[in-house]
A protein has these predicted regions:
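A generic local structural motif
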Residues: 54, 78-79, 128-129, 182-185
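A short alpha-helix capping/helix-coil boundary motif
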Residues: 17-23, 109-110, 130-133, 186-188
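Glycine-rich phosphate/pyrophosphate-binding loop regions near the starts of catalytic domains
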Residues: 1-93
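Gly/Ser/Thr-rich helix-start
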Residues: 14, 55-56, 73, 85, ...
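Short, acidic (Asp/Glu-rich) active-site segment that either coordinates a divalent metal cofactor
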Residues: 65, 80-132
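Glycine-/charge-enriched secondary-structure boundary and capping motifs
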Residues: 27-53, 59-66, 71, 136-137, ...
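Active-site-proximal beta-alpha loop/turn segments in soluble metabolic enzymes
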Residues: 22-27, 107, 113-115, 193
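Catalytic-loop motifs flanking and including active-site residues across diverse enzymes
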Residues: 1, 130, 148
Length: 238
């Protein structure tokens, strides 16, 4: 739950500072759940440089409910929103897409080939450092929680533009014995990847290549923005 909130910070090009946490949990589950949950939080707090400053712990009848409010800061007061794209901008995405959906679909498989996918599903990696690095390059950005198509549509709608996505350029995970159509469907519609999807001017493409090398994160040019025409999302080579 903390990592999902950290991904929201990353999508704004912001640095997370601290957070509040509220947990509602049945008493019979607290003894087993709380120590493990606290251990995971402490590890993430240290790794991402964020502190817990307050919150609340209450008892519930049945379900475990977790609410997090996160606070951060932007560089030079420059936060990236979802509505800054211009016609002619390029569309980039970090990492590979569809891995989390593959992990979910094969969660109970005993095959070790799905271990990385399961980890991606259970423990998403918020791209906080990447978001900070492209803060002045990206002019609109979102983290992919609902799949490439739906989240790209959010960017297109907010800027009142169409996005042309080249299906052949979408970065897919590599799995032997899984058909490309299945991998592509997971990437386009699966969600929970928490990679960054963003727009930038064509003149920034070289700078992004340098950032990709520096951060050891693949940044793939998957499409471009154009004046709105009929649909928000246009798929090429589909």
């Amino acid at each position: 739950s903390l990592r999902v909130n950290l991904s929201d910070m990353a999508a704004m090009g912001a640095r997370p500072i601290f957070y509040n946490l509220s947990i509602s949990i049945p008493k019979k589950k607290a003894k087993n759940f709380i120590p493990k949950f606290a251990k995971g939080l402490c590890e993430d707090q240290e790794f991402f440089g964020i502190k817990l400053i307050g919150g609340d712990l209450t008892s519930s009848l049945q379900d475990i409910n977790i609410t997090i409010t996160i606070f951060g800061e932007t560089l030079n007061k420059n936060s990236v929103t979802r509505d800054g794209a211009k016609s002619g901008d390029l569309l980039f995405v970090s990492g590979v897409l569809g891995l989390s959906k593959i992990g979910l679909d094969n969660f109970y498989s005993k095959s070790k080939k799905f271990d990385s996918a399961k980890k991606k599903y259970l423990l998403p990696e918020p791209r906080v450092n990447l978001g900070l690095s492209i803060n002045k390059i990206a002019n609109s950005m979102i983290d992919i929680s609902d799949g490439l198509i739906q989240d790209a549509c959010h960017l297109a709608k907010n800027s009142n533009l169409s996005i042309v996505i080249d299906i052949e350029k979408v970065p897919l995970p590599s799995f032997i014995n899984l058909k490309k159509d299945l991998l592509l469907d997971a990437a386009l519609y699966g969600g929970d990847d928490y990679e960054l999807l963003f727009s930038c001017r064509p003149t920034h493409e070289k700078a992004l290549k340098n950032i990709s090398i520096e951060k050891s994160i693949d940044l793939t040019h998957v499409g471009f923005f154009q004046d709105f025409h009929e649909d928000y999302i246009i798929l090429k080579n589909y």
